[in-house]
Amino acid sequence: MPLYEHVMIARQDLSNTQAEGLIEHFGTVLSDNGGKLVDHEYWGVKTMAYKINKNRKGHYAFLRSDAPAPAVHEMERLMRLHDDVMRVLTIKVDEHAELPSVQMQKREERGDRRERR
């Protein structure tokens, strides 16, 4: 099956558990349509470069999936219809990277710097 990576931005007024619940919800959508959610990372609340739907911040999540194209199209369709999801980006990749994403690596480096002080 093809491999995909998705980045989702959810509204800032959601709690962290609600944002994680969105990830689980869309993972079940994939599994119901014959795919699977391989891995996901919650990047936290980040400030955006410009306002989207009058929001300056958003909950960012990164998902890796192994699913057929119709399952991904259905998940994207439901994400775009969901009121809590502001933006979705999906790309098809040849293989998933084993390491954490660049955003998570940056977070770990920042954590190391804070401990040194």
Curated annotation (Swiss-Prot):
Cross-referenced Gene3D superfamilies: 3.30.70.60
Keyword rRNA-binding: yes
Annotated InterPro entries: Ribosomal_bS6 (IPR000529), Ribosomal_bS6_sf (IPR035980), Ribosomal_S6_plastid/chlpt (IPR020814), Transl_elong_EF1B/ribsomal_bS6 (IPR014717)
GO molecular function: small ribosomal subunit rRNA binding; structural constituent of ribosome
CDD domains membership: bS6 (cd00473)
Keyword check for Ribosomal protein: yes
A GO term from the CC aspect: cytosolic small ribosomal subunit
GO biological process: translation
Alphabetized UniProt keyword annotations: Ribonucleoprotein, Ribosomal protein, RNA-binding, rRNA-binding
Protein family according to the UniProt entry: Belongs to the bacterial ribosomal protein bS6 family.
The protein's role, per its UniProt record: Binds together with bS18 to 16S ribosomal RNA.
Name recorded for this polypeptide: Small ribosomal subunit protein bS6
Species for this entry: Roseobacter denitrificans (strain ATCC 33942 / OCh 114) (Erythrobacter sp. (strain OCh 114))
